[in-house]
Each structure stands twice: as structure tokens, then as C-alpha cells.
Amino acid sequence: QMFPSVDELKAYTGVLRPRNLELFIERVENKLGKENYKKYFDATAALSLLCYKADLEMMRRTSALAGFQMLDLQDFPGQGTAVVGILNALMQSKGIISAEEFRSWNDDVVPLWLADSYTYFAGSELKSSIKISNNSATDLKNATLNWSLNSEKGAILSSGSFRLNAPAGILSEAEVLNIVLPSTDKALACKLNISIAGTCYRNSYSLWIYPDIKALAVLNNDVKLFSQYSEELENYLLAGGKAILMPDKNAYPQQTIGGLFTSDYWNYSMFKSISENAKKPVSPGTMGLLIDAKHPLFDEFPTETHSNWQWWAAVKNSNPLILD
């Protein structure tokens, strides 16, 4: 799921009224502020795309796959409203991704990167492989695949190319990559770009490189760590102190929800009742992170304003607090 687009409301100029979207947007704006809505829309849309890419690539990595059905390319206004589409309910673009970018991981031919992780230590060896999912009607013969590992600013950290053959209708092993990552004392956000020369087929993957630090030095003694909210913490803050509140797992059992990295599926209220009736755990219903990426806290942890794979372990092991 993602937040609905405010721009979609303008498309209803006839007898139809998007009451469902109006109600949802009104609730969010009243709670979070109208001026902040676009930030939440962008963050939830980015996470939804990240999850779609992972799901579709997972299927393409399946040998002898006959095909798949995507649920759904567009939003579904029934069943309580499922804002799950890359397009809105009117089959119009939401402006969250271009057709060209979407095809980079959902075309008749897709280059795939297979690795054990998205996060690595500086100076380590990145062992991975590239496969080609060729569902076109044409064999790729003696084609050239180019790859490059680029920094966030576009600098090439490593690159190479190789020849490949990818018969139509199958998943082909193209090449094993062994990349020695650069030594660095500062965390790097990188992008692995792969493309087949002379074609429109390309793909890219985010990954992160961190200094191999065995022990963390305390750089600022005036930042204290607290495991629960207390009078001591309150007085410390009122006196001008800086603190990080990292509650213990069982500190606030009635004010926490489970850590969920992926966006909520389809419609929360619908599957909440289904889960309760089946006596199954109910999803937290969360929609990912909205991050102040420029905060000094992230000087050594490069991040966008939305969830990405470097957050996986932290989110899965978290106990988010309900603050309102």
C-alpha cells in the first residue's frame, strides 16, 4: 500500500466522487499537517516500489517460471480501498516512477543481480552473480553486459564488462562478480548499475559500504542513552541535554507495535478482521519510515527519506512506539 495521491482528486470532474480518498487524505492531513502530506506520500510510494521490485525479481529468479500476475498495476477502490497500484484507479500515472524505470525490472529481458546482502564492510570482497531473465522471443547471442559500482555522487568505484549468451525462455547464469570494495573510514551509499550494450535492458541496485570498526568510540558525552521515559530523562532534556530513547522490548507493551519493514498489504481493516477471525497475528499495518535524512544522527549512516534495505535489520528488530 501507499498513501493516495492528492492530485488524483482533480481527475473526478463528473458524477463520481472519490469519497474514500477524500476521507483518508483528510484524516492524514488533520493528524500530520496538510503541509506534510506530500512527504508521507513520497515515502510510502518509494517503499511500495522497492517491494514490488523485490517481488517481481524474486519470481524472475525462479527457473522455468511460466509467468506471473501482478496484483495490482492500478489501485482498487473496493474492499475498503486498496491503494496498491503504480497507477491510480483511473489507470493514470501517479508520478512515482517513469515507464522506462519500471521496465528496468519488469521487461521481457531483465538483468538480475544476486547477492547475500545489501550491506558490506569496507575492503571486503563482494561475491555475487548476474543472471539474465529472458522472456523475449529472441536469444541474446554474444551480447556485452557492462557493470559499474558507483558512489552516491556518481564516481566509478569499480567496473567491468563481459560477453554473455542468454537463450530465450530461460533464466541464464551470466557471470560471477568478485568485487573488492574500497577501503573507507566513512560510510558510502552506492549503486550497482548493469546494462546490456546496444539494448534498452538495464537494472540497478542500491548497496551500502561501512567502515569495519571493531569498537565504537563515544564522540559526544552529552548524548545519553535511555531505555525508558522517566523523570530523569525529562529533567535532562529540560536542562538542555541531548538523549536517545531506545526502549526495552517490554517497556511499553500497550504502546508498541511489531517491527514491519514491508508496506502493509492491500487493506488493513479487511485483513485485520480476516486475521482475527482465523485467530492469526494481525499485521502492524505500518507503511514504512519517513526519515529526516539530513539529521546529524545519520552522518555515518547514509539514508534517503524513505525505507531502504539498509534499514531491514533495524526495523525488523524494533519496537516502534505509538506517540499519539
Identify the residue ranges that each predicted region occupies.
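Substrate-binding clefts and catalytic carboxylate motifs of secreted carbohydrate-active enzymes
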Residues: 1-141
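Flexible loop/turn segments at secondary-structure boundaries
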Residues: 2, 75-82, 156, 232, ...
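Beta-sheet entry/capping signal
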Residues: 65-69, 223, 242-243
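Beta-strand-rich binding/interaction modules
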Residues: 123-165, 172-180, 187-197
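C-terminal edge beta-strand
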Residues: 162, 205-207
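Short, exposed coil/turn segments at beta-strand boundaries within extracellular/luminal domains
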Residues: 198-203
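Low-complexity, Pro/Ser/Thr- and charge-rich linker/hinge segments at domain boundaries
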Residues: 208-228
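A glycine-rich, often tryptophan-bearing local segment used as a flexible ligand/cofactor-contacting loop or short
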Residues: 228-314
